[in-house]
Design a protein with these regions (language model features):
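Outer-membrane beta-barrel porins/channels
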Residues: 1-299
Length: 299
């Protein structure tokens, strides 16, 4: 039997936030996020010929997930040091989580043309987005910057009752396992180096060079064992003009998941590459910000 899996779709996020500085160098903020999107998954199962030489009967399954959810966040930030030479910032955020109740439409087809529906139904799944606590610190000098974050996610809480079972392999190599949601902890660290942001002669010295590392666990356990996952990142920030903090950001990421228990349980070890490009617009305080939205005046 040959299996072929395919999938496509996307989830879009819109976020609105509001910040307030009640005391000098101390800020609080709130935010609301709305998610929506559709994800389609298809599998094709093609067995060996059973109705005659060269003739096959294939089975096709299609799942469509329609997602919609809203959740909120609060956060605080304290600039312990803030001057022209150094910045030291501490921060924390709390995410309230929310209910993610996807509408799932499942269809099963059989036959070479996949036009005979043998089973089809629509259900609503119950899945809770986790509450999340994140704390971090950031330190910056003229050339160097380093940041550290710790993130805790409460996946196990209200999702603890959702357990699944599965098998891998066959015959003597067949392995049964139980899958359950679990709380996760992740540590992140990144460093940035900018040789000289104000260098007028050497363009590459104005670039920012970045590297990072992330280590944690997946949000599901297999027979009580957690899937470890980690990633390494690298990137550059290309300033839009000399002395500017606004930049075009380019980054790559390589990650692995499940390498610690995949072989023992007969699971697939996952590895991936990501490429990202973005734009950072910096419009800070008047004394050190960039005047993107002010009309120039000439004497």
């Amino acid at each position: 039997i040959q299996y072929n899996y395919q999938g496509e779709g996307d989830v879009t996020e819109v976020k609105v936030g509001l910040g307030w500085e009640p005391f000098k160098n101390f800020s609080v903020g709130i935010a609301a996020q709305y998610y929506w999107g559709d994800i389609d998954r298809t599998f094709v199962m093609t067995p060996t010929a059973i109705t005659g030489e060269g003739t096959f009967t294939s089975t096709v399954g299609q799942d469509n997930y329609s997602i919609s959810s809203i959740k909120g966040q609060v956060g605080v930030q304290w600039n312990a040091i803030l001057n022209a030479k150094r910045i030291l910032t501490f921060g924390a955020t709390y995410d309230f989580g929310g209910d993610l109740n996807p509408e799932v439409t499942k269809k099963l087809y059989i036959g070479d043309l996949y036009n005979t529906v043998v089973k089809g139904d629509t259900t609503h799944l119950k899945l809770v987005l986790p509450r999340q606590l994140a704390v971090g610190a950031y330190y910056q000098t003229g050339r160097w910057a380093v940041g550290v974050d710790y993130v805790f996610q409460n996946w196990g809480g209200r999702n603890s009752g959702y357990e699944m079972t599965g098998t891998s392999g066959s015959g003597e190599n067949k392995t049964e396992y139980k899958v359950a949601y679990t709380n996760t902890s992740t540590i992140k660290m990144g460093v940035e180096y900018t040789p000289n942001r104000y260098d007028a002669r050497h363009f590459l010295k104005r670039w920012s060079y970045r590297a990072g590392f992330r280590y944690g666990a997946y949000n599901q356990t297999f027979n009580g064992d957690k899937l470890a996952q980690y990633a390494v990142t690298a990137g550059i920030g290309i300033p839009v003009r000399r002395g500017a903090f606004s930049a075009i950001d380019i980054g790559v990421e390589y990650g692995r998941r499940g390498y610690n228990i995949a072989d023992r349980l007969g699971l697939v070890r996952q590895q991936y590459f990501k490429f990202a490009i973005g734009f950072t617009l910096f419009a800070g305080q008047m004394e050190n910000g960039e005047y993107w939205f002010m009309r120039s005046k000439f004497d």
